Amino acid sequence: MENVNRIVAEGIAAVEAAQDFNALEQIKARYLGKTGELTGLLKTLGQMSPEERKTIGAHINECKNRFQTAFNAKREALNEVKLQARLAAEALDITLPGRAQEGGSLHPVTLTLQRVVELFHGMGFEVADGPEIEDDFHNFQALNIPANHPARAMQDTFYVENGDVLRTHTSPIQIRYMLDKKEPPIRIIAPGRVYRVDSDATHSPMFHQAEGLWVEEGVTFADLKAVFTDFIRRFFERDDLQVRFRPSFFPFTEPSAEIDIMGENGKWLEVGGCGMVHPNVLKNVNIDPEKYTGFAFGIGLDRFAMLRYNVNDLRLFFDNDLNFLKQFAK
């Protein structure tokens, strides 16, 4: 029995001295494995008398239990050390100041839209809105665009399954507003997203427009020129900005014009289209063209943003590059 006590004492001492799980498992194998020292003692019981086998066998089993208890305790201790080390590594210093959330900012196109609306609001225009998916009547027919007009072609317009379209301009907002209001005077600015099959450095399949409309008795082309010239000079903050109105054609206005401004390079730059509302358009919204006249104009807000912020590629606005967009934060 003295030999058994010595072996188990040495085993327990080795267990308590183990520094890691690998060493602990090796000690267990040395004493309780198939060829372990305590296991080997049990194999000698067959050589003993029944009385000795009973007494010594019970003692060996007791020693094995003591060893296993010491082993379990050491394993728990090593687990606790491992846990504490991990917690220490992951500990948060709650005395450190927090990181401030970086504030967002408005998109440059949104800033441009707001500036346009602000300027026209100051001239008595109210903001109107409408759906981005339009039917044929509001997007084409009511605006004096016949069935064979090139603007209806598949290569220019996004059609949906039921024949409706993604609006190609914000003019349908004007139609809906006039039909709803019934009677002039009407003075609105209609900003929003529009869609056309086009994509390059200065065009996008989705872009932003703002269209203005003024319908009232006695409105003339001179009023159109005065209003738009005042707006464009205020927008670019240049009282001496040269503006010209160049004859053009649109099915929904007559007469029609393209609007140009003088660029810093000394060349004319197109910034919009305009004209007197076509009598057929007024008839389509139940307004008497013999009594009322009106003008309409349209500008590309993305184009205005490019000019305002000196950006030469429209696609940069929609690449979601935060480093680029942060330049325009206010």
Curated annotation (Swiss-Prot):
Family the entry assigns: Belongs to the class-II aminoacyl-tRNA synthetase family. Phe-tRNA synthetase alpha subunit type 1 subfamily.
Gene3D superfamilies according to UniProt: Bira Bifunctional Protein, Domain 2
One of the GO BP terms on file: phenylalanyl-tRNA aminoacylation
Superkingdom of this protein's organism: Bacteria
GO MF entry, a single one: magnesium ion binding
GO cellular component, one term: cytoplasm
Requisite cofactors: Mg(2+)
Chain positions recorded as Mg(2+) binding sites: 254
The keyword Coiled coil belongs to this UniProt entry's keyword annotation: no
InterPro entries named in the record: aa-tRNA-synth_II, aa-tRNA-synth_II/BPL/LPL, Phe-tRNA-synth_IIc_asu, Phe-tRNA_ligase_II_N, Phe_tRNA_ligase_alpha1_bac, Phenylalanyl-tRNA_Synthase, tRNA-bd_arm
Localization: Cytoplasm
Assembly and interaction partners: Tetramer of two alpha and two beta subunits.
Cofactor note: Binds 2 magnesium ions per tetramer.
Gene from which the chain derives: pheS
Residue ranges the record marks as coiled coil: none
Catalytic activity: tRNA(Phe) + L-phenylalanine + ATP = L-phenylalanyl-tRNA(Phe) + AMP + diphosphate + H(+)
Name assigned to this protein: Phenylalanine--tRNA ligase alpha subunit
EC number: 6.1.1.20
Presence of the UniProt keyword DNA-binding in the record: no
Keywords: Aminoacyl-tRNA synthetase, ATP-binding, Cytoplasm, Ligase, Magnesium, Metal-binding, Nucleotide-binding, Protein biosynthesis
